[in-house]
């Protein structure tokens, strides 16, 4: 009877360990998904929105560029390196996060007299040394797929 109890106890511990491993893996992968609401906040980079439109089109709040840049860079730095270019893509083109009531979010608005391609070109450089000096997963100094060049790497 003791060996039967011991065997049941071992099976229970093994099952619990497997369950914990599965939960840990699911939790880790959820934290690394570059989608709004997970590794990227919903409607990401509001300060970068202002910084991009201010620098490219002269539209935005009456804050000096260095202050807008500081805020933008802080928001971008808070996003994991492997999601920064994705966050900038969402800034330009938007994304529909997972969920039953999900709607397009994060997209920089079309502004009269402010060409979208000019904004896109500047947004692609926000991770560069001249702007925020931040690392990305691509290993290049900017996010070229925002401009339509290359494909976005996955983690």
Swiss-Prot record:
Matching Pfam families: Tryp_alpha_amyl
Q: Which residues form the propeptide?
A: 139-155
Oligomeric form and interacting partners: Monomer.
| Entry-linked CDD domains | AAI_SS (cd00261)
- The protein depicted here goes by the name Trypsin/factor XIIA inhibitor
Q: Which GO terms describe its cellular component?
A: extracellular region
S-S bridge residues: 34-83, 48-72, 57-114, 73-132, 85-143
**Organism encoding this protein:** Zea mays
This molecule's function is given as:
Potent inhibitor of mammalian trypsin and a specific inhibitor of factor XIIa (activated hageman factor).
**Further details from the record:** The sequence heterogeneity suggests that 2 genes exist for this inhibitor. The genes may be alleles, or multiple loci could exist.
PROSITE patterns in the cross-refs:
CEREAL_TRYP_AMYL_INH
Range of residues in the leader sequence? 1-28
Localization (cell) = Secreted
Q: Which family does it belong to?
A: Belongs to the protease inhibitor I6 (cereal trypsin/alpha-amylase inhibitor) family.
The parts of the chain that form a coiled coil are none
Where mainly located? secreted
The family database entries (InterPro entries) matched by this protein are listed as: Allergen/soft/tryp_amyl_inhib, Allergen/tryp_amyl_inhib_CS, Bifun_inhib/LTP/seed_sf, Bifunc_inhib/LTP/seed_store
Which residues are annotated as active site?
A: 62
Gene Ontology molecular functions: serine-type endopeptidase inhibitor activity
**PANTHER family reported in the protein's UniProt record:** TRYPSIN/FACTOR XIIA INHIBITOR-RELATED, TRYPSIN_FACTOR XIIA INHIBITOR
Sorted keywords for this record are:
Disulfide bond, Protease inhibitor, Secreted, Serine protease inhibitor, Signal
